[in-house]
Amino acid sequence: MKILVVDDEQDICEILQFNLETEGYEVDTANSAEEAMMKPLENYDLIMLDVMMGEMSGFQMARKLKDNANTADLPIIFITALDDEDNTAKGLNLGGDDYISKPLSIKEVKARVRAVLRRTTQHNKQVDDNTDY
């Protein structure tokens, strides 16, 4: 499974990359939404996306992903210090699959990543099982 971590804090990217790689995931990082948008996003199984970044926010990037047919079904976990009800609801309403508040608990991050990927994998299997060939 391939994960892209997008956060303007390099330390967060490195911590998440190290810990998720120890779980067996292949992890790439980007320090801005603009940098992330230049990657072949359809090749990832999950995007972990900081909300507050420079030019383009995580919410803006999520909107672009959901508006593109190639990335519309890509799961998103928002990571943010904006730990309030309005921002959580906004992220989920934009198509986010989960919302994790900073400071991060690595144990919680790993569990949430597993849960989102498990749901996505099960959904994709159901779609495949229901497809007539």
Residue ranges and their predicted role:
Residues 24-31, 35, 39:
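Short hydrophobic/Thr-rich beta-strand motif most characteristic of the beta2 strand and flanking loop
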Residues 7, 50, 80:
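Active-site residues of response regulator receiver
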Residues 2, 118-133:
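Short, Lys/Arg-enriched segments at the junction into DNA-binding effector domains
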Residues 43-49:
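Active-site beta3 strand of CheY-like receiver
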Residues 10-28:
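Two-component/phosphorelay signaling modules centered on CheY-like receiver
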Residues 13, 53-54, 72, 84, ...:
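The feature encodes the CheY-like receiver
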